[in-house]
Design a protein with these regions (language model features):
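Glycine-rich phosphate-binding loop of ATP-dependent small-molecule kinases
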Residues: 1-222
């Protein structure tokens, strides 16, 4: 099974993506990790990508698409979950064209939907336990809301990540994601149109619900 997953930062996309990956034994392919690996290995594409990243610019699609395809064909030959790409409509169209040319099926596209303000509240509400950062604590989610400044799992002290409190950075990321004309949602809707044509499946999930309910809904639809 080959799967694309969309969802704004704060929607629980990582949690549900991990569920799908583990349940179907898929390779988890994340665009940021692809760049880091190529740069670390000093590949030609990695060197080209680094030149743009060092200047604070987006890596062009003619570099990104070949990187993604290479990983899909090698690491994902038995099935993959692609996360973090495409980020805009142009990339979505180019990715689809490349998949068609390579004869790679896209079996399913998952979109986790969440109101922009709620997504922002969840990001800013995240708290890290000093004993184990994997303990779920979020002051904006009732199901995992901590008791004051102590971890709801172990009682350890909690702190917030500085980047989770950077409203400007959060807003910029969400500006890209929630752009329905050219941004990430436009990319998701491109695949939704393909699903209407019978070329893939498109699963929409209400991300405002609790994790277990979303999980059950997702597994039922898959």
């Amino acid at each position: 099974m080959n799967v694309l997953i969309f969802g704004p930062n704060g929607s629980g996309k990582g949690t549900q993506g991990s569920l799908v990956k583990d349940r179907y034994n898929l390779a988890h392919i994340e665009s940021g990790a692809i760049f880091r690996n190529h740069i670390k290995q000093g590949t030609e594409l990695g060197q080209k990508a680094k030149a743009y990243i060092d200047q604070g610019e987006l890596v062009p699609d003619d570099i990104t698409i070949p990187m993604v395809l290479e990983v899909l064909k090698n690491e994902g030959k038995d099935g993959w979950l692609l996360d973090g790409f495409p980020r805009n409509l142009t990339q979505a169209k180019k990715l689809w064209e490349a998949l068609q040319e390579e004869g790679i099926n896209l079996d399913c596209v998952i979109e986790i939907q969440l109101d922009r303000q709620e997504a922002k509240d969840r990001i800013m509400g995240r708290r890290l336990c000093e004993n184990d950062p994997n303990h779920p604590n979020n002051v904006a989610i009732d199901a995992i809301k901590p008791d004051g400044d102590t971890c709801r799992v172990c009682g350890g002290a909690l702190k917030s990540r500085s980047d989770d409190q950077d409203e400007d950075a959060i807003d910029k990321r969400h500006d890209i994601y929630y752009d329905t004309q050219n941004g990430t949602l436009a990319a998701a809707y491109f695949f939704k149109d393909l699903a209407r044509q019978g070329k893939t499946r498109y699963i929409e999930l209400d991300g405002a619900r609790d994790i277990q309910t979303i999980k059950n809904d997702l597994l039922n639809q898959l």
